[in-house]
C-alpha cells in the first residue's frame, strides 16, 4: 500500500492537488517556496503531503487505497465510542517530527476556520506525549504562543494567517 500511496501522491502533486482546498494549496505553496529562508526537509514535506493527500485528494486518486479505521471493542462501541483513522509517519530522530506536527496542526485548524462545516478538519488538536519533558517541549505547538510558536519560529504559517490559526486550540498532555 505504501508504494501505491507514493505513486498516487506524485500524480496528485503533478496535477496541482485536485480536491485540495484553497487553504491547503496556499500552505503547500508556502511550504515549498524555493525562496524560503527556513527550508523544510524533504521528509517533512513528504510526511505532511501524504497525510493531506489521504484526506483531501479527489476520490479517483484514492481508489484502491483503504486505510483501516481504529475501531473500539464491541463493549466500547455500546458505550458510545466510535472508531477513527490513525495515520503514522515513520521519521528518524532529528528528521523534524515536531515540525510535521506543526504543519499538520496548522493545516487542520486553518481549514476548519475557513470552512466550519467540513468534518475532515478540526480546530482542536490533542498531542499526547510519553513524558513531561516532551510535553513541555511540544507547547510550541500552541498557537497562542504567537511569535514563540513553531508556526512563526519555523515559518510554517504566513504571518497574515496567524489570527485565524489563533482560533484553534492545541492541547498537549502526557
Segments from the language model and where they lie:
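RecA-like P-loop NTPase motor core of helicase/translocase proteins
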Residues: 1-174
Amino acid at each position: 500500500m505504501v508504494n501505491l500511496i507514493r505513486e498516487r501522491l506524485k500524480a496528485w502533486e503533478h496535477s496541482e492537488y485536485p480536491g485540495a482546498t484553497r487553504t491547503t494549496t496556499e500552505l503547500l505553496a508556502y511550504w515549498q517556496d524555493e525562496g524560503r529562508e527556513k527550508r523544510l526537509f524533504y521528509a517533512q514535506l513528504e510526511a505532511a503531503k501524504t497525510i493531506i493527500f489521504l484526506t483531501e485528494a479527489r476520490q479517483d486518486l484514492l481508489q484502491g487505497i483503504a486505510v483501516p479505521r481504529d475501531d473500539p471493542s464491541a463493549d466500547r462501541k455500546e458505550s458510545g465510542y466510535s472508531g477513527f483513522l490513525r495515520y503514522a509517519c515513520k521519521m528518524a530522530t532529528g528528521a523534524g517530527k515536531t515540525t510535521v506536527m506543526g504543519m499538520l496542526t496548522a493545516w487542520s485548524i486553518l481549514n476548519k476556520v475557513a470552512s466550519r462545516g467540513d468534518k475532515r478538519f478540526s480546530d482542536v488538536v490533542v498531542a499526547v506525549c510519553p513524558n513531561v519533558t516532551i510535553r513541555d517541549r511540544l507547547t510550541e505547538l500552541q498557537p497562542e504562543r504567537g511569535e514563540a510558536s513553531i508556526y512563526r519560529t519555523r515559518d510554517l504559517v504566513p504571518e497574515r494567517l496567524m489570527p485565524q490559526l489563533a482560533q484553534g486550540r492545541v492541547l498537549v498532555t502526557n
